[in-house]
Amino acid sequence: MATKKIRIRLKAYEHRILDAAAEKIVETAKRTNAEVSGPIPLPTDRSVYTVIRATHKYKDSREQFEMRTHKRLIDIIEPTQKTVDSLMKLDLPSGVNIEIKL
């Protein structure tokens, strides 16, 4: 029989909020006696945007902005119904994107 696994992928712009959300998920899963693998840090996406400072000329004067997307992966192996229910009721901080695959 194949083992069931829940894969949770978290994304956020701030790594402190992301780590706090990951810790809450791991604590909740361990409280219900589920085996947890993670949080595994995934590579950070970095987007750099270059903008000309002046409106009409002075192309040599530019400003760069960057956006970093931090990611974490958590696997919950052999989850019970109690684990799934407690994860659904979990209140996570705003600013964290959550993708769940069964």
Curated annotation (Swiss-Prot):
Any single GO CC term annotated in Swiss-Prot or TrEMBL for this entry: ribosome
One GO BP annotation of this record: translation
UniProt KW keywords: Ribonucleoprotein, Ribosomal protein
Cysteines engaged in disulfide bonds, as pairs: none
Pfam family, one: Ribosomal_S10
Keyword Endoplasmic reticulum: no
Top-level taxon of the source organism: Bacteria
Molecular function, one GO term: structural constituent of ribosome
HAMAP family: Ribosomal_uS10 (MF_00508)
Similarity comment text for this entry: Belongs to the universal ribosomal protein uS10 family.
Role, per record: Involved in the binding of tRNA to the ribosomes.
Record's subunit section: Part of the 30S ribosomal subunit.
Listed name of the protein: Small ribosomal subunit protein uS10
